Amino acid sequence: MKRYLVVALTVCLAFTFNFSTATGAVKAGAACKKQGQVSISSSLKYTCVKSGKKLVWSKGVAIARPVVAITPSPSATPSPSATPATLTPSPTPTVNSLVECKLPVADGRGDVSIGGWPRISERSKVLGDVTATVIMVDFPDAPATMTPAEALARISPAQDVFKEMSYGKLSYNLKPQLKWYRMSKNSSDYVSGGWTFIKHRDYITEAAKLADSEVDFGNTDSLIILANPDAKGMGYSGPAFSAIRGSGITLDGRYVSNGATSAYDLNDWKSIWLNHEITHTMGLVDLYASTTSDRSNRYDGLRYTGEFSYMGLSSYQSNSPGLLAFERWNLGWIEDSQVECVKSSQFTKLITPVQISGGTKAVIVPISSTKAVVVESRRASGIDSAMSKSGALVYLVDSSIQSGLGPVKVFPSDLVNDPRYLKAPRALGESVTVEGVTIKVIQSDASGDTVEISK
């Protein structure tokens, strides 16, 4: 979407008029000498007129100052009058500045957020080449039996996923030290009582120091500690390392504030574990529910977004694990020119599938300073090849809500009949209303979904 800046410039022009110019102040009703005489004073034009038996100055008339509007096609027809014409203003646009759709960081955490333009300063690079140093560790109670190369193969597909999600804008490059380093304590000792930030950082620091004599961390952007996948004592939570306020680790003169450590659940999630955790280090939040609402519902953790986005509870085999358009926009993988921020009462737009590059990727309707309705198009392709229903996906983003508590909610929501949100995308003729905004699909084909938005 091209946007042009319209600048108004006041232009001072010198004109030659067939009248005299007064050197002193002129007042309406004051006596003048010659009928028809014209005088200019304080940007007002006065004419000497007959009033009864007297000649007096008429009421002053403002002299128009010409204004030139600079536009892409400045072709205006001058008025036949002495005053240069102004260009006719364009109709009020239906698409507004993106400012209102770029939701702020407003959840009070400080390390990750669904909002943020600009992004949180200590989060990882998201464009170009990112070097991820991989250190492999095992434990006295769980010595590795697989080779380092076999362990690396568990996470290496994540590189291609990042390339797909970013439309080739991010090259996340694993740089492994293919050697097992033995940690000083049993695996369960590190996670006993649960991870805290300090315990997690100490674990990473110990692993890095074990390898320091053989590894140059000078170019490290992201640090991965890959634990022996057979170490059950590491539990089922391999968290991201997202330091803030200078609390990261300095290695070989390089400050490192982003990374991740694996756990036993790597065997279940496989390399999408790395995509999920590293995307935290890029600043994004958990979309799955971190609290329990209904213990009888086995899909309770999916109650906000179902199986959309791998920032929820999505594996490679899930319905549609590709990142949402809003997430990709926040990371700079979708350009501003591919987003429409709409405040008009009615708007129609073709949205191209998020799975392919090019075209409009999202239509966003701001609701408040922290909340917006987003519409995107999804198709069964690439990482989303298992998607059961294509169409326009509608969701509400609220940057005042913290990670895991529902910062994104997909609609329509039917937790009884569709707890995985498999039927959520709107097909041709289907609609949904969110926050007073109605979205209806009026055309759908391989090129995407044309939606009509009204409120």
Task: Describe each model-derived feature in a short phrase.
Residues K2, V6-V95:
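Polybasic, low-complexity, intrinsically disordered segments
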Residues K102-D107, S113, T145-M146, A240-Y264, ...:
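Non-catalytic C-terminal accessory/binding modules of secreted extracellular proteins
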